Amino acid sequence: MFIKDAYNMRALCTALEQSAPDTIINTSKEENNSYYCATAHLLRTDVCSLVNRVGIEPLKSGSILSTLEELWQAVGIIYRLYEWQHVSDIDTNFKKLPNNSDFGLVFSVLDCDIGYVITGKKDSKGNIELYDPKNSLLIENDDIKKYLYDENFHRFCIMLIISKSELEELSRESCDQKCIMG
């Protein structure tokens, strides 16, 4: 299990746009301005600036974001190396994950400033379980879409799935690229 904290995704994207415009590769904004997506390569100084602006606390119990270096890697992975996807693709993406694996899922609900990072497991039979670190709820297969998608309010999630092995691999790649770029 990894990345157990929630943080303000919209503020992070806004700060990213303001603090490091030269590093932005691609940004997009929905017509209703409800959310931002950004893809960028972040340097260490950019992360320091983002931490100061957004108020992310890198030292939190139970989190891998225990140092600024790890925060840089996590933010870099989320915003530089992955694309956001609509929650309707959730089944397809879960099927791609290998059985007996841990993974993380990042989502942000429209009209809600907070983006959450939750963890999950895929067992040997392919069943999915999600764990919400905020209230320690266990969300099982039948309730996952209900948890992530509210038809009554026409809200949906922007999501990112990271397998644990991918996270470790991309952390190394991110660190290597950062070191190369100085």
From Swiss-Prot:
Keywords: Plasmid, Secreted, Signal, Virulence. The gene is yopQ. InterPro entries: YopQ. May function as a virulence determinant. It is found in: Secreted. GO terms for cellular component: extracellular region. This is Protein YopQ. Residues 1-24 form the signal peptide.
